[in-house]
Amino acid sequence: MSKRESSKYKIDRRMGENIWGRPKSPVNRREYGPGQHGQRRKGKLSDFGVQLRAKQKLKGYYGDLREKQFRAIFAEADRRKGDTSENLIGLLESRLDAIVYRAKFVPTVFAARQFVNHGHVTVNGVRVNIGSYRCKAGDVIEVREKSKQLVTVLEAVSLAERDVPDYIEVDHNKMVATFGRVPTLSDVPFPVVMEPHLVVEFYSR
């Protein structure tokens, strides 16, 4: 387990929410942040604080993305025609690691990034080892033959705690997924409320 994967519950505690809907999340048992003094009562957040928290939650959900990387994704979303917040979600959900996670080939988004980086996945028959690789509608994502018996994959496929969204078609017997379309915010099965419009406000200050 990577250090970034092991930090996933710290993100839950910091946000005070079970952002991936995991049964073992510590916030299912307590209502305070990480650290010895997490029990301290929090004051009301300012508008800036609310916007920052929305950004940190969305950034954390997709594997605790680096700020520089997340800002670049936002900048592209802002350049595109249409609603910037919807563009942002579409770009994040088009990432290869996000699709591997959504397809239930791995248990966590952190594991998805590592899985892709280690060369276990192909896109349209070509091995891709970059988690941020942007998939297009119609792309076929497959777990490589020699990787299909990995314990991590077999355990993830058997999990019933999350459903595959309808914009991804998956054959778990063959471990093949087709990215049907770029989703909108309402399509994405977030376990908690995500507010990308507040992220837009944060970067538009």
UniProtKB/Swiss-Prot annotation:
Basic and acidic residues biased stretches: 1-16
Lineage: Bacteria, Pseudomonadati, Pseudomonadota, Alphaproteobacteria, Hyphomicrobiales
SMART domains: Ribosomal_S4, S4
Subunit-level organization: Part of the 30S ribosomal subunit. Contacts protein S5. The interaction surface between S4 and S5 is involved in control of translational fidelity.
Entry keyword Ribosomal protein: yes
Region described as Disordered: spans on this chain: 1-46
Keyword Ribosomal protein appears in the UniProt entry: yes
GO cellular component: small ribosomal subunit
Alphabetized UniProt keyword annotations: Ribonucleoprotein, Ribosomal protein, RNA-binding, rRNA-binding
One GO biological process term: translation
Source organism (scientific name): Rhizobium etli (strain CIAT 652)
Protein name in UniProt: Small ribosomal subunit protein uS4
Molecular function GO terms recorded: rRNA binding; structural constituent of ribosome
NCBIfam families: PRK05327.1, rpsD_bact
Gene3D superfamilies in the cross-refs: Ribosomal Protein S4 Delta 41, Chain A, domain 1 (1.10.1050.10), RNA-binding S4 domain (3.10.290.10)
Function: One of the primary rRNA binding proteins, it binds directly to 16S rRNA where it nucleates assembly of the body of the 30S subunit. With S5 and S12 plays an important role in translational accuracy.
PROSITE patterns: RIBOSOMAL_S4, S4
Disulfide bridges in this chain: none
